[in-house]
Design a protein with these regions (language model features):
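Double-stranded RNA-binding/processing signature
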Residues: 1-159
Length: 159
């Protein structure tokens, strides 16, 4: 992978420092520009945060060892559902910075046109806030903070 990134940076004139993160790589290859994160709607942040969190969970599960896909799916589904995300927020909320808490609140208070089938409205709103926070941290390029919060919220024994 590193060799192909080096080759890509040599042939396309890409900045090697920017290639060290997924977001930087996407920005360079697709000519994207960073936007002011405060301009994103909380539901847009939740949209990307949902995918980021799902990828983190799936990566952890796959890296723990090869097993049947249906087992991976069941375990991942239990960890990404609204009820679990809501419970995680109860654990990690005291850890949030003022800025992170503001993003979480905006996501939690956003009025979504949909609702999870198997969650209470309170759980769904807290989960939306959690996903908005994950999206915000991803777009801020703070993956280490995402991992820190996920680890604290889930705990290693649940995975």
């Amino acid at each position: 992978m590193e060799a192909s990134l080096n080759n890509m940076s040599e042939t396309n004139g890409l900045n090697k420092e920017s290639l060290s993160s997924l977001k930087g790589l996407l920005n360079q290859v697709f000519h994207l520009e960073d936007k002011d994160l405060r301009t994103y709607s909380p539901l847009t942040l939740a949209y990307i945060g949902d995918g980021v969190y799902e990828l983190v969970i799936r990566t952890i599960l796959v890296k723990k060892g090869n097993c049947p896909v249906n087992q991976l799916h069941r375990k991942a589904s239990s960890l990404v559902k609204a009820g679990t995300q809501s419970s995680m927020m109860e654990v990690i909320e005291p850890m949030l910075t003022e800025e992170e808490h503001s993003v979480y609140r905006r996501g939690r208070n956003a009025h979504s046109p949909t609702m999870a089938k198997h969650a209470t409205m309170a759980d769904y709103r807290r989960a939306t806030g959690f996903e908005a926070l994950m999206g915000y941290l991803y777009l801020k390029d703070d993956f280490s903070r995402i991992i820190e919060l996920v680890r604290a919220g889930i705990g290693e024994d649940q995975i």
